[in-house]
Amino acid sequence: MAAAAGEEVEAARWAEAEDERKEGLRRRRRYGLVEYRALPGYMRDNEYILRHYRCEWPLPQVLLSAFSIHNETLNVWTHLIGFFIFLVLTIYTATQVPNVVDLQSLQHLPDVLRNADLHKIQTELVACLPSLPHLSDLQKLKDELKSSWNSIEVLPSLSRWHLLELLSSCLPHRFTHSNETSLSVLQSMKEDIANMIAPQLIRPIPRWPFYAFLGGAMFCLLASSTCHLLSCHSRRLAYIMLRLDYAGIAALIATSFYPPVYYSFMCYPFFCNLYLSCITILGVATIAFSLLPVFQNPEFRTIRACLFFGMGASGVIPVIHKLILFWHQPEALHTTAYEVLMGLFYGIGALVYATRVPERWMPGKFDIAGHSHQLFHVLVVAGAYTHYHSGLVYLKWRDVQGC
């Protein structure tokens, strides 16, 4: 009896172990990669990518799959890395705004001025300038300061005697040794004076259009990366993620217009507001259209590509207008060259996306790496990065010249 009971217990253990092994196999098969033909209809998007699909995995496994190999791995990381690139660029740009003078860089003013509170002196100088006959024209000083960016001579109208007059009249209780000040010291002081009054007379232009573009780029890249990571979880989450992805594309295209339009036409408010309003309305309309359920169907791939390409191509109008107004400005030509290059990146990306090249030529050969959507992602990041450099040119141009 005891022996029989022992055999029954042992048999039960073996049966339990076998059940656990089969359950483990079923779990691994369920969370394994499948072929295109095994996908539900809502996940079928590109019939030329044949294998390595994740299909309706639980959310924890979906999140962890960012660090495993499947046919969406590079789609996730190309735009996630792009997001962090633009995050760093945004932080860098925010630290480069020329909004105050570096008082530590002044060479001779602290030696010549008694008990110098340089921040207070900066305000006193600007307030006093209009009272001096030779320096009352603040617009002339602004123009000279702007031209000094590309000139060896700083403030040519501020001669030695005018400088002495400025210091003795505007800072009578601070300035001493006027007759003992050498020409070399006066020249250096002249540069210091220019450095002090420049931020008060020449304010940096608004940065919000540039930050709007950077925000649109980061939103697009992060939304795209998240979409490619999470859409395999369920039909509902795929529905939400795809619309977020399309909204990100529209946001990137729309906000890409903001820097060139605002900085090109900031002195022409009518055209500036007209172009900004048109592209904003077009972007909102595109997002609304993308909410339609049929918009995500595979047969609408070409329509999606044409819609986004047409939205971007509408930027040709303000670019041509800019060239008509500023054909003599090197900055206008420089920014246009960047914009043409950006358009090439985006245009080629849209073409690759719509035609599904190269995987349509060799189905199954580019499942993991090299298929069209990955190339499209790389071209989008390249186009946005090119546009970032165009924006830097606009900022420097308008900071120096204003209207």
UniProtKB/Swiss-Prot annotation:
GO terms of biological process kind: response to hormone; response to sucrose
Keyword list, A-Z: Membrane, Stress response, Transmembrane, Transmembrane helix
Keyword Electron transport: no
Compartments reported by the entry: Membrane
InterPro entries with a match to the protein in the record: AdipoR/HlyIII-related
Pfam families recorded: HlyIII
Segments passing through the bilayer: 74-94, 210-230, 247-267, 275-295, 307-327, 332-352, 375-395
GO MF, any single term: signaling receptor activity
A single GO cellular-component term on record: membrane
Membrane topology: Multi-pass membrane protein
Name of the protein this chain belongs to: Heptahelical transmembrane protein ADIPOR3
Organism: Oryza sativa subsp. japonica
Source organism phylogeny: Eukaryota, Viridiplantae, Streptophyta, Embryophyta, Tracheophyta
